[in-house]
UniProtKB/Swiss-Prot annotation:
Keywords assigned: Pyridoxal phosphate, Transferase
Keyword Transcription: no
Species of the source: Halobacterium salinarum (strain ATCC 700922 / JCM 11081 / NRC-1) (Halobacterium halobium)
GO biological process: cysteine metabolic process
Protein's UniProt name: Probable cysteine desulfurase
Biological classification of the source: Archaea, Methanobacteriati, Methanobacteriota, Stenosarchaea group, Halobacteria
Chain coiled-coil ranges: none
Reaction equation(s) it catalyzes: (sulfur carrier)-H + L-cysteine = (sulfur carrier)-SH + L-alanine
CDD domains given in the database record: SufS_like (cd06453)
Family to which this protein belongs: Belongs to the class-V pyridoxal-phosphate-dependent aminotransferase family. Csd subfamily.
Single GO term (MF): cysteine desulfurase activity
Gene3D superfamilies with a match to the protein in the record: Aspartate Aminotransferase, domain 1 (3.90.1150.10), Type I PLP-dependent aspartate aminotransferase-like (Major domain) (3.40.640.10)
């Protein structure tokens, strides 16, 4: 299973840790799972970590002096340390566990945005943002009188950085940018955006849902004020996301939810708050999920994030080349050697939903629709697209199966 940091991945050994990949679907077809941008699969060591928690030391955290509670509390706190270090943070005080990236976005928008924004302030997003960013900041803007602006994309799917430099001004309070587009695969220069934002006294929130699972991330090198990602896209369980925040910002922010464990002292008149990250984790937290996500980080780091990135880049470039050479196929976004592990496309005369249904008949699982980026699809001039996305356990043979199934669909719909 393991590889050196720069060495190739032993894909067959990796696949052995994922029994689901041995499934047959659609009446006997081998499963070709290419929907990793939506969710990844979970390896046996991570499943074992969840089972071990429930079998051996299931208990609430920060609430008991008995041995089980102490064991669970230590494991849960250590998971914060591990996830903080995974993205280049310094310690657990900078790592809040949420239920997903969307909740992390909402936490910042409502704990920081509602208290800090007002008329005359601007929040600058990109045209390729996920609905979790778009809708959230639109709602905060409606409540505060702030204005939301959007950095346009170029014809080849990159961010227009000249426009970004013009749009980010002293009126900008926050820049929200996706690190890797879940539709175009564009890898955005978030470090450059952070520099521009900070030059104008603004903060930057980076949506790392597609980046953190697939490449080494260093929030200090980026100089991100906030960086969010989800466990289920990086071999972890569902129900857990992560929000990195600079320590001083989290310390200054008001809580997002209220209840147990996020308090320091409560009286009948008022309350004071616990320190970060606990003041943002009200109630019984995501204990099993946090412990399992730490195990997923171990799994990824044993293989090596550089090795994972190299494997995905090779697969993505191959898929891009094969699809662009296929008649009647339009591929969106940057060239194949300049993108994350996502390829969105359409086949002339076939709606993306119909294409996905036909591909399923051949065992190929992709996503079809707007991928929670309706405004971006409006910009592209299409109502929907098909999306193939790759991860560490995918192979060139699976890309070939995708392309062959697309060609079969073309034949079915041929006039």
């Amino acid at each position: 299973m393991e590889a050196t940091e720069q060495g190739p991945i032993d894909v067959e050994a990796v696949r052995a840790d994922f029994p689901i990949l041995e499934r047959e679907v659609a009446g006997g077809e081998d499963l070709v799972y290419l929907d990793n941008a939506a969710t990844s699969h979970t390896p046996e060591p991570v499943v074992d970590a969840i089972a071990d928690y429930y079998r051996r030391y299931n208990s609430n955290v920060h609430r008991g002096l008995h041995e089980l509670s102490q064991e669970a509390s230590v494991a849960y706190e250590d998971a914060h340390d591990k996830l903080a270090a995974f993205v280049g943070g310094e310690d657990r005080e900078e790592m809040v566990f949420t239920k997903n990236t969307t909740e992390a976005e909402n936490l910042v928008a409502f704990a920081w945005g509602l208290n800090e924004l007002g008329p005359g302030d601007e929040v600058v997003l990109t045209q390729m943002e996920h609905h979790a960013s778009l809708v959230t900041w639109q709602q905060v803007a409606d409540e505060t009188g702030a204005e939301v602006k959007y950095i346009p994309i170029t014809d080849d799917g990159h961010l227009d950085m000249d426009a970004a430099a013009d749009m980010i001004t002293d009126d900008t309070a926050l820049v929200n940018a996706v690190h890797i587009s879940n539709t175009l695969g564009t890898v955005n220069p978030v470090g450059e955006l952070a520099d521009i934002a900070h030059d104008h006294g603004a903060y930057i929130f980076v949506d790392g849902a597609q980046a953190a699972p697939t490449r080494a991330v260093d929030v200090q090198e980026i100089d991100a004020d906030f960086y969010a990602f989800s466990g289920h896209k990086m071999l972890g369980p569902t129900g857990i996301g992560c929000l990195y925040g600079k320590r001083h910002l989290l310390a200054e922010m008001e809580p997002f939810l209220y209840g147990g464990d996020m308090i320091e002292r409560v009286s009948y008149e008022d309350a004071t708050w616990n320190d970060p990250p606990w003041k943002f984790e009200a109630g019984t937290p995501v204990i099993a999920q946090g412990i399992a996500l730490a195990e997923a980080v171990d799994y990824l780091q044993d293989i090596g994030m550089d090795a994972i990135r190299a494997h995905e880049e090779a697969l993505t470039e191959y898929a891009y080349d094969q699809l662009t050479m296929t008649d009647d196929v339009d591929v969106y976004g940057p060239p194949g050697d300049d993108r994350g592990a996502v390829v969105s496309f359409n086949v002339d005369g076939i709606h993306a939903h119909d294409l996905s249904s036909i591909l399923n008949d051949y065992g190929v699982a992709i996503r079809a629709g707007d991928h929670c980026t309706q405004p971006l699809h409006d910009t592209l001039g299409v109502p929907a697209s098909a999306r193939a996305s790759f991860y560490l356990y995918n192979t060139r043979d699976e890309v070939d199966a995708l392309v062959a199934a697309v060609d079969e669909a073309r034949q079915i719909f041929a006039p």
